[in-house]
């Protein structure tokens, strides 16, 4: 606190005392005058009473003391309210030497709660809905989550690059002027110097290649080099197939659910999210934002689907299992330490076709894929989908192994 501000504070307190003394004096005179008028009226009403006896009988000192006490209480209440307000303003760090800043701590809080600058808001791309209507992925109608109105072909949309949510410019601009997050998913929209935004497209949900099976399995993978773990979560349409997963102690599978990039259920946000092919998305965003957009590699196949994404690791090897559309197992080991090699053990299918192979690095690794009791319970004994039993070990031992 500067000396000037302290001087003004002292002046206000001293001035308060002066005004209080004058107020007390005025109230005391008013009390005396009212008491004299009351005596005059009462003397006229008695008609013949003695003036001395009337004055002594009608003067009530208790009432006068009570009035003075009440006035003093009101004065001290006003004084302490002003004093407490001054102390609060001092805590807020205001400069009371400047009379224009007095009482502006609420305005300071409003400034701290401001949203994005207009220059940042203008960096979010805008376009007409008719230009992307035929290119968007998904058949559900697209709506603005602020006004809940469906977009028309001639309306202008504003895209939030971080979450791909779209709004009317009038709706979202009013929000962003007082907030710094997306109103739908609460994504932080404040740009950080040197930050590069990564726009992640979930494989299978965007950029589906021509000829791919729309009912095929879609998979998202997370690699953990520290724990040498790759855990995959299969988004299968056939929920009757049991899932198996093996991990090194991290329950990473629970981190990924059937949701989109915002962390909320996709069925609730599809009508507010504009999903475009990656190249079109980059064309919309890159002219206004000098940031990097990266897409995850597409893990799909028109002939084979991934039934499960469970993985195990043994002796610096990664194993993954996948099943083609006929339910035949394809198990591939890959070494993560040089030299990188894979080994295979050919096993002829009962039908005699040479195209079905079971690949593994050693007989021990096949034990990791042995059929669990849940597979026996749900799939039955005659179903060969996902079957890796000890019977295969005997047939595999009879076939020589080839090292690539």
Curated annotation (Swiss-Prot):
<keyword id="KW-0732">Signal</keyword>
<dbReference type="InterPro" id="IPR053238">
    <property type="entry name" value="RING-H2_zinc_finger"/>
</dbReference>
<protein>
    <recommendedName>
        <fullName>RING-H2 finger protein ATL11</fullName>
        <ecNumber>2.3.2.27</ecNumber>
    </recommendedName>
</protein>
<dbReference type="Pfam" id="PF13639">
    <property type="entry name" value="zf-RING_2"/>
</dbReference>
<dbReference type="InterPro" id="IPR001841">
    <property type="entry name" value="Znf_RING"/>
</dbReference>
<dbReference type="GO" id="GO:0008270">
    <property type="term" value="F:zinc ion binding"/>
</dbReference>
<feature type="region of interest" description="Disordered">
    <location>
        <begin position="385"/>
        <end position="404"/>
    </location>
</feature>
<dbReference type="GO" id="GO:0016740">
    <property type="term" value="F:transferase activity"/>
</dbReference>
<keyword id="KW-0863">Zinc-finger</keyword>
<keyword id="KW-0808">Transferase</keyword>
<keyword id="KW-0812">Transmembrane</keyword>
<keyword id="KW-0479">Metal-binding</keyword>
<keyword id="KW-1133">Transmembrane helix</keyword>
<dbReference type="InterPro" id="IPR013083">
    <property type="entry name" value="Znf_RING/FYVE/PHD"/>
</dbReference>
<comment type="pathway">
    <text>Protein modification; protein ubiquitination.</text>
</comment>
<comment type="similarity">
    <text>Belongs to the RING-type zinc finger family. ATL subfamily.</text>
</comment>
<feature type="transmembrane region" description="Helical">
    <location>
        <begin position="64"/>
        <end position="84"/>
    </location>
</feature>
<dbReference type="GO" id="GO:0016567">
    <property type="term" value="P:protein ubiquitination"/>
</dbReference>
<keyword id="KW-0472">Membrane</keyword>
<feature type="region of interest" description="Disordered">
    <location>
        <begin position="339"/>
        <end position="361"/>
    </location>
</feature>
<feature type="signal peptide">
    <location>
        <begin position="1"/>
        <end position="36"/>
    </location>
</feature>
<dbReference type="GO" id="GO:0016020">
    <property type="term" value="C:membrane"/>
</dbReference>
<feature type="zinc finger region" description="RING-type; atypical">
    <location>
        <begin position="144"/>
        <end position="186"/>
    </location>
</feature>
<keyword id="KW-0862">Zinc</keyword>
<keyword id="KW-0833">Ubl conjugation pathway</keyword>
